[in-house]
Amino acid sequence: MPTVYSSVVLTLDCLGLKKDGVFKAFAEGLKAESWFGNNLDALYDLLTDRENFLTVDLLHWEEADLTEAERFSFEALFEDAAEELAGRLKIRLIAREF
């Protein structure tokens, strides 16, 4: 019998969020507050340790209050996680809505 996967779409508004706020938004959005460690390793695990398809829309990503290094680290993690899940994870960085 083939495996059936569910699909989850998560929308997070990143306007003005600092690094810890981005971690908190993911933890709350994916219901992982009880164990999430507020670091890049925990975020990677949260995104990749799943059976379902996941699409994350990060609204106002460019308006998050992140340093260049923090933004680069998040984006590299998103790319690595999406690559590991081979099509089951999509993260869309949405700068603005009109």
Feature locations, PLM:
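Positively charged, polar, low-complexity stretches
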Residues: 1-98
